[in-house]
Amino acid sequence: MPQENIARRAFISSVTALTAASYSRVLGANDAVQLGVIGPGERGRFVMSQFMMNPKLQVAALCDVYSEQIDKAKQKATAAKTFTDHRKLLEMKELDAVLIATPDHWHARIAIDALNAGKDVYVEKPLTRTIAEGPEIVKACRINERVCQVGMQQRSGIHYLRAKAEYIDTGKLGKITLARTWWHGNGYHLRKAPDSLRDKPSNLDWAHFLGPVKWRDWDPQQYWNWRAYLDFGGGQVTDLFTHWIDVVHMFMGQEIPKGASAAGGVFAYKDGRTAPDTINVLLEYPTDFTATFEATLVPGITGAAIEMCGTEGRLWIDRSRYEWHPKGRNAPPVIVQAEAHDMTLDHVNNFLECVKTRKRPNADVLIGHRSAQASHLGNIAYLERRKIDFDPQREEILPF
């Protein structure tokens, strides 16, 4: 057995070593939130920078399996302690909260460990890699009375909330029967590993990176572009559709599909990836509407957006603006531009406010579970090549 495999088995067997004891401290209105960052890669460092815009926050700890990522984050968080094992970071009693920005296959395990350690959690979407992980995270959050925000920042986006209030809540669209979503040409899923990673760096713990995933020898592409491999995430469906279906859920007040269908494959980029480069997902909801997702890594349509289609018109929205198109061939549209800043800052500030007030955040853990669950159903339909029937009450896939 390879030495790395032995190390990995030992690591996995000890993952449950954390106790459920709460290390949380009571924060006063003027106390600085002490934050630990787990996974300070490219996205993690950006979200960390949004946290650091709050003067009442200090990044007290950094953790990553690759010390180069820690070194880059340390340039901003100069006083932070550093770790390569998240469990050691969670032993810090002074920590109030953690930001989890690891690859998707680690989200659930680290989130549960953090919640059981008494930390509030901001975790990047998707919350889970499997449907089964969702209820476990929700349970850990509720039992430990923690705040858990999932990084679906549209929930805090001002123009999304305005569009909902003006056109959805007022009923101006009439009966909504279709929510169309699409995301074309996302280059992040086409990243190529740099030559510097051809051989595994000595300061990168590959066994720890794999964690709950089946052992395989070092593969720079699977490390660098893990989104292209279904062992580590759900491809474009969980990475991109989770954002859009969450907006649909927010608009419609309906979060649990009753059925899912999908079709797609690896049609253009035959580079060893297991996640489809092109996929279409169709979800059916109990309140008589469907939601679709169309994704391809080829250029296709410019950008990504959502279109809510009703009997009285349609609402088109993306991260830069929304457009109201009343029914009628000659009816002029209403176009409203969004404010020129990243919604992640609003989402982070909502989380930090809830850390102080103990209220539930805009993208609470249950909301995150439901949106990830909808995406997972799409992937299951794709992988099993069949229509999935889902019981919205019991949240279970029905037998054939």
Regions from the language model: what does each represent?
Residues 45-49, 68-72, 87-88, 108-113, ...:
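Pocket-flanking alpha-helical
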Residues 98-99:
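N-terminal Rossmann-like NAD(P) cofactor-binding module of classical short-chain dehydrogenase/reductase
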Residues 1-16:
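N-terminal secretory signal peptides and thylakoid transit peptides that target proteins
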Residues 146, 161-162, 172-184, 189-227, ...:
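Contiguous beta-strand/loop segments that form the cofactor/metal-binding neighborhood of enzyme cores
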Residues 14-77, 154-157, 248:
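N-terminal Rossmann-like dinucleotide-binding module
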Residues 92-94:
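Alpha-helix C-terminal capping/helix-to-coil transition sites in glycosyltransferase folds
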Residues 81-85:
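Conserved SAM-binding strand-loop segment of SAM-dependent methyltransferases
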Residues 103, 108-156, 171, 385:
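Beta-strand-loop-alpha-helix segment that lines the small-molecule cofactor/substrate pocket
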